[in-house]
Regions:
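Glycine-rich phosphate- or other oxyanion-binding loops that anchor nucleotides, phosphorylated ligands
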Residues: 2, 26-136
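N-terminal beta1-alpha1 ligand-phosphate binding loop
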Residues: 3-25
Length: 136
């Protein structure tokens, strides 16, 4: 079995890495190759943000994985979640579209910028519709 673990920072997956045998990690590489029992694990460190995560994940997905898992805080600002909790995502937001005021995250709605969010969502839907027609 071959697994891809995606995380923004190495810090977020250090508990996992401590249980594995590190096979290779070049300083200029974003992938830490390791194993656990007979399972091959590639840990991809993307950097923070949805753009970095999408870009670097797309780069490694040309390899064949049996399972891909996004680990770490995954952009959440929910302090009620315990460290180590497993979360099933059924809805998502543009987490980076907002701001922090020093104490909390302010959404586009909080900032009274919902119209921009709506336009962005509509543009995203149009982009997805266009992409469906591209040859694979």
């Amino acid at each position: 079995m071959k697994i891809l673990i995606v995380a923004a920072t190495k810090f977020e997956i250090n508990p996992l890495l401590s249980l594995t045998e590190i096979i290779s990690f070049a300083e200029n590489s974003r992938v830490i190759k390791c194993s656990y029992k007979k399972i091959e694990i590639d840990c991809l460190i993307t950097g923070v943000g949805m753009v970095a995560t999408a870009f670097y994940t797309a780069e490694v997905l040309n390899k064949s994985y049996d399972l891909a898992i996004n680990m770490g805080i995954c952009g959440t600002f929910n302090n009620n979640l315990d460290i180590g909790s497993v979360i099933h995502i059924y809805e998502d937001q543009f987490a980076e579209m907002g701001a922090e005021d020093g104490e909390k995250f302010l959404s586009m709605e909080d900032l009274k910028l919902e119209a921009i969010t709506k336009i962005t969502n509509e543009a995203q839907s149009e982009i997805y519709a266009l992409l469906e027609h591209l040859p694979k």
